Every structure is written in C-alpha cells, then in structure tokens.
C-alpha cells in the first residue's frame, strides 16, 4: 500500500509539472518580457468557451463611402421579389398557346432592366450632385484667393509671377527692418544723451554738497576739539591740535583704546580706575 501511494504521488507531481509546462509553453510571437508578465492559461481555458468574434459583411464601408449601395439594394429588392413572385405564379395552365410563356419571361426581363435603369439614373444623379458641389467649392476657393490678393490669374499672366511677388515681399521686409533699426538707433542716442546730462547734474550737485558739509564739519570740529565736556582742558590735553580734526567721538576715547588695546573690557587695570 505504501509503495502504491508513493507511486501515485510521484505520478501526480510529474503530471502536474508536465501540465504546468504545457500551459506555459512559449509561442513564436511572444518575447521573454511578455512570458514573465502574461498568464497563458487563460487563453487555453477560454478559447473554446468564448469563440473569436467574426466581423459581418455589413454596411459599415458602404455608409462611410456613401456610394449608395444600400439604396440600390433597397430599391432593387422589391422589384426582384415581385418578378420572382410573378415567375412563380405562372403555371402551365396560365400559359396560353403560341408562346405566351416567352412573352411572360420577356416581361420579367423588362422589369429587371427597368429597375437596373432606375438604379443607374440614381447613380448619375448622385455623380452630378457631387460634381456641382466640387465646382462650388472651387469657386469659393478662387474668390478667397482673389480677396487675399494672390490670385492665380495675375501670377499666370507673367512668366515669373511668383518670383516677382516673392521679390517684392522681400524688398518690403528689408525696408521695414531698416526703418526699425533706424528708430532703435535714434531711441538709443536720445537715451544716452539724457543719461549723460543726468550724470553731469548729479556730479555737480554732489560736489556742492560735499563742499558745504566739509565747511560746516570743520567749524564744528574747531569749536569742540579742545574740550572734554565740562572738565575743560587738562594737563594731559592733546598736543596735536594743529592736525586736521577727526571728530569729538574719536578724540575722546583715543587714549583708552590706545593704552588698553590688547585687553578685554573686563581686564582693565587699576590705573584706568585711578585715572577716572
């Protein structure tokens, strides 16, 4: 029993792998990328359940082309049916002596020819309508071209009509470009002159202001250079008063920053506090 079960298991696994490989077999049109992403068993399972759809030979092409085949079929079907009914309705009893049957067949043929003639008339009418529409469209196009000023008649009269028109257009374009360049040059010249005048005015104004401010500052420095608030001049007053003044804020703290330059504000010596 155990050996039989083992054999059955082995057969089942082998059959499963074989079926799996058969389902995943590669076709001629498939690539490796599609083989990874596709699930092939769907096609084999549903191939017979859902047969492929067939396109019927319907009236799609005839409707798009507009050749009137439907009208011919609609118009010709009743006539053929009537002739067939008439032909079937004839019997030996109805046919008289002397070739009445032949006359009946001729009547049927005449009816068929009449229906074909009617269909031919319809085709000719449709062709005439199409030709009229094309002529109207051509007339409209010619009118549009004449309105735009480039009619075919004017160009056809001269041997090189198109070339002359193109040359005239190029000349007009060149003239317009030259005019635009001249206008740009004039505008640049005017802007340059205006900017130079403004620069000269601003420089003169700056010089006048500098002269006025320097005179006032010198007067202020001369007044305040020898004083240190309410104390007045001391023994250790500045000996270089003849030099150009540099401002009261600098002269008041020159000795402090010169003597204690290498120390921080928290490392002032006793001399600083004693002199204060």
Curated annotation (Swiss-Prot):
Post-translational modification summary for this protein: Phosphorylated on serine and threonine residues.
Top-rank taxon, per record: Eukaryota
Keywords, alphabetical: Biomineralization, Cell adhesion, Glycoprotein, Phosphoprotein, Secreted, Sialic acid, Signal, Sulfation
Record field: compositional bias (Polar residues): 145-165
Biased composition, class Low complexity, residue ranges: 189-200
Comp. bias intervals (Acidic residues): 61-75, 120-144, 167-188
Residue list for modification Sulfotyrosine: 272-273
Name of the protein in question: Integrin-binding sialoprotein
Organism encoding this protein: Gallus gallus
Lineage: Eukaryota, Metazoa, Chordata, Craniata, Vertebrata
């Amino acid at each position: 029993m155990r050996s039989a079960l083992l054999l059955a298991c082995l057969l089942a696994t082998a059959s499963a792998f074989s079926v799996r490989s058969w389902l995943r077999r590669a076709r001629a049109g498939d690539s490796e990328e599609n083989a990874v992403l596709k699930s092939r068993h769907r096609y084999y399972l549903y191939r017979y359940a859902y047969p492929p759809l067939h396109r019927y030979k319907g009236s799609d092409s005839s409707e798009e082309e507009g050749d009137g085949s439907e009208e011919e079929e609609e118009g010709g079907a009743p006539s053929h049916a009537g002739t067939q009914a008439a032909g079937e309705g004839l019997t030996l009893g109805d046919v008289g002596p002397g070739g009445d049957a032949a006359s009946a067949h001729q009547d049927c043929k005449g009816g068929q020819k009449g229906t074909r003639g009617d269909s031919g008339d319809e085709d000719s009418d449709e062709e005439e309508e199409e030709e009229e529409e094309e002529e109207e469209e051509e007339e409209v196009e010619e009118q549009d071209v004449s309105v735009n000023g480039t009619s075919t008649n004017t160009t056809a009269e001269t041997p090189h009509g198109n070339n002359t028109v193109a040359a005239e257009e190029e000349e007009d374009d060149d003239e317009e470009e030259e005019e635009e360049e001249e206008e740009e040059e004039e505008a640049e010249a005017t802007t340059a002159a205006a900017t130079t005048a403004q620069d000269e005015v601003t420089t003169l104004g700056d010089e006048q202001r500098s002269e006025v401010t320097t005179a006032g500052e010198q007067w202020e420095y001369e007044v305040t250079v020898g004083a240190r608030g309410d104390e007045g001049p001391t023994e250790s007053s500045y000996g270089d008063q003849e030099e150009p003044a540099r401002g009261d804020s600098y002269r008041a703290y020159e000795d402090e920053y010169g003597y204690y330059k290498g120390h921080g504000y928290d490392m002032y010596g006793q001399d600083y506090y004693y002199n204060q």
